[in-house]
From Swiss-Prot:
One biological process term in Gene Ontology: tRNA N1-guanine methylation
Reactions this protein catalyses: guanosine(37) in tRNA + S-adenosyl-L-methionine = N(1)-methylguanosine(37) in tRNA + S-adenosyl-L-homocysteine + H(+)
Originating species: Campylobacter jejuni subsp. doylei (strain ATCC BAA-1458 / RM4099 / 269.97)
Keyword Amino-acid biosynthesis: no
Subcellular location: Cytoplasm
Record-linked CDD domains: TrmD-like
GO molecular-function term, one example from the UniProt record: tRNA (guanine(37)-N1)-methyltransferase activity
Entry GO CC: cytosol
Pfam families: tRNA_m1G_MT
Subunit details: Homodimer.
Protein name: tRNA (guanine-N(1)-)-methyltransferase
Amino acid sequence: MKFSFVSLFPNLMEFYFKDSILARAKEKKLFKLNFYNPRDFSKNSYHKVDDYKIGGGAGLLIQAEPMYEVLRSIQEKKENPYFIFLNPSGKTFNQKDAKRLSKKEHIVFVCGRYEGIDERVLEIFANEVFSIGDFILTGGELPALVMCDAILRNVNGVLGNMESLEEESFENNLFEAPAFSKPFIFEKKNKKFYTPSEFLKGNHARIASLKTTLASCKTKFFRPDLFLEHERKK
């Protein structure tokens, strides 16, 4: 699988893939990375890519020409690029999208800055437009990294234990059950906090049943909307 990032600040993203699970997956050649800077495709001597909006309005906009050129150059490599634009007006990214997109050959994340990208570029290239929530960020780089991370976790071999993926939150519209580590009794300020005793008895069937119950309770408490969706699909 291949990921390309189109950004005015590619250095902000490269570091993310240098440690931990994704670094190991990259070393195993489970995915490839490319970074493109629209400034390199600007036709003016100052590599300027932004200008004021036609019709007025605050802030600067990334112009159509350099964005068109960089995306067209990616298209011409004929690596089945799937263009994803990051925009607050896009649909909210979720775990189902992460699973679906993990089957793509080549995802291109197009990251905006300033007041965004000339709308005509989206009309020409966008396969999908995503947001990661109802809030505004300085640019599309963080949402692109969030999505890339979530997608890669669904690529075979990236996680050392596929069972970890199956047990993660949002599977079957439920959060992952609460997790506990040693010590079995955690004591602070004269208060004792216990691990559920059933977890210590070694009966795997009963532990699995308790985890399902706890996952349901956790989801119902924190995200009743997800819990209702889970109940509806039973």
